[in-house]
């Protein structure tokens, strides 16, 4: 049934009397909860929070892009896989840890994250992407401040910053 009152933005088209339900388009008897969704293949929420906390010097609300230093806050930017997992995923457990993540500004098509995804050589030199087969724990990353650091697997490191000053075998010695 169509009502006679015009739309709010002064259109002459009539307004439907009842809005369409959210379940339009689903097969009969199926709810939105039963639809198959794509499995989560990225970092876990805990790892994303650890990387964001590391980038915010202990406070995820103060997170900055680890490459350019722009302020991102709690919800800006994206966590980049430094060593890509590959199309079939990976069996290497290190690639799912905070040692393989960097918080970068932009999306996979823009900003620092876009540069890393496009395999920019400058991003490779600063450690924001590495070829497959590389151990991300052993290659340093150059932060926006110019500081050269290694990433801790647990996202915390010995001093709680998430960064190591030397390669893991050097720190352990």
Spans of features found by a protein language model:
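Short linker/helix segments within small regulatory modules
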Residues: 83-101
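Short Cys/His-centered divalent metal-binding micro-motifs
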Residues: 70-73, 95-125
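Residues that flank catalytic or metal-binding motifs in active/ligand-binding sites
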Residues: 61, 78, 99-101, 137
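A boundary/linker detector
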Residues: 1-64, 69-73, 130-173
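Histidine-centered catalytic micro-motifs
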Residues: 78-84, 109-110
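Residue-level detector of alpha-helix boundaries and kinks
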Residues: 36, 89-90, 108
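Short cysteine/histidine-rich metal-coordination sites, predominantly Zn2+-binding motifs
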Residues: 81-89, 122-132
